[in-house]
């Protein structure tokens, strides 16, 4: 079998983590089988669909490394195909125009609710005569088009994740609306209908989507049969849940891929984490995967049925692993946009080699790329604010004399090196007859404003290169008076 799968997002919002995870599973399955991964934009909701959302979806997929083989195809450009399919069902007597008003539908639901029955359409307009249709039209009623569903029919399929699935026609809520009212006789085709037409036309072999589509699958199988088409294989993947076991939503914070990017997650770290959201690798100890490596191992036998809990701590850990293993030059490229967004200036000697030295200093401490903004602030600011602990340190006996001695020693240096910096510290310890700890703490506070921070010598070298070490030492001396 030639594997052909699709990801079919609706451009009514930014690329969602759930849609992206579905895209990951489709991509992995396609690559595992040497198949085709198709992008289809389901923009039949003309009122809510926006081109900026389409762009966000496509940009997000590319950023994650989920490049598609065919598409993008836009449903809004395929309406003729859908309307012909609606007409075919009408001509074959498999669908009909329903003129039931919204008020009548509401009254029906209330009556069913009063009896303790599940809401469903009672198919009252399934057998209208031409005269009855004409009368409804004369009354100014609009219509929807419904596909006939046999209440006695049992719909069975073997789900690649969940095994045997079985639904009765009577569980599907009555005859299915496949097109809403419009100016033409075939109406405006709806989502549940057009996806089937597209999947038939694009020869989709496997439909891989979230478990919240299971009820749709039962209805859509009947549509495949109505058109005499081959029914694809179905795989319904687990939903993404929050740590309390509820479906992940905006109330849980970030849910769109572009938001994750802004928060400082790498594409590799995020897509690695999404791969493990519901799928277990054969080697349970292996957690770090490239997409290509995961594709070699990916099967639906190892996709879980239970919901996948979104664990921020696990995502942070995975992300940090990718950051720590990214070469300095590449990591610098990743960090520059975050520094620019923070308004940091690269003037005053902060050239590319200097930036790469800064990245080398900070990289091991980064969990997210955004961490570099706060950690590097002291290197992009002309002055630093003293922390409470830093102020106390400068009031320690001997701190002022130590800092004055360091400035004096710097006057003899044309270019500070690591060895020269170490020698200055040794000289000051000996000349001032103080412990090395006092010198190191005083110097750190003078340069960084705090008693804690990145490697002191490397920080000093970076600040020296852009001429900020002496001014900060002088500032600290003034603060120690």
Curated annotation (Swiss-Prot):
Location(s), subcellular: Cytoplasm
Ranges spanned by the short sequence motif 'HIGH' region, renumbered to the chain: 9-19
Catalyzed reaction equations: tRNA(Glu) + L-glutamate + ATP = L-glutamyl-tRNA(Glu) + AMP + diphosphate
Family matches, as Gene3D superfamilies: 1.10.10.350, Glutamate-tRNA synthetase, class I, anticodon-binding domain 1, Glutamyl-trna Synthetase, Domain 2, Glutamyl-tRNA Synthetase, Domain 3, HUPs
Chain ranges for the short sequence motif 'KMSKS' region as given in the UniProt record: 247-251
Single GO BP term: glutamyl-tRNA aminoacylation
Leader peptide range in chain numbering: none
EC top class named in words: ligase
Binding site for ATP: 250
Main location per the UniProt record: cytoplasm
InterPro entries, per database record: aa-tRNA-synth_I_cd-bd (IPR045462), aa-tRNA-synth_I_codon-bd_sub2 (IPR020751), aa-tRNA-synth_I_CS (IPR001412), aa_tRNA-synth_I_cd-bd_sf (IPR008925), Glu-tRNA-ligase_bac/mito (IPR004527), Glu-tRNA-synth_I_codon-bd_sub1 (IPR020752), Glu/Gln-tRNA-synth (IPR000924), Glu/Gln-tRNA-synth_Ib_cat-dom (IPR020058)
A molecular function (GO) term: ATP binding
Keywords in alphabetical order: Aminoacyl-tRNA synthetase, ATP-binding, Cytoplasm, Ligase, Nucleotide-binding, Protein biosynthesis
Pfam families: Anticodon_2 (PF19269), tRNA-synt_1c (PF00749)
EC identifiers of the protein: 6.1.1.17
GO cellular component, one term: cytosol
Function summary: Catalyzes the attachment of glutamate to tRNA(Glu) in a two-step reaction: glutamate is first activated by ATP to form Glu-AMP and then transferred to the acceptor end of tRNA(Glu).
Family, per entry: Belongs to the class-I aminoacyl-tRNA synthetase family. Glutamate--tRNA ligase type 1 subfamily.
Quaternary structure annotation from Swiss-Prot or TrEMBL: Monomer.
Name by which UniProt lists this protein: Glutamate--tRNA ligase
Species of the source: Trichormus variabilis (strain ATCC 29413 / PCC 7937)
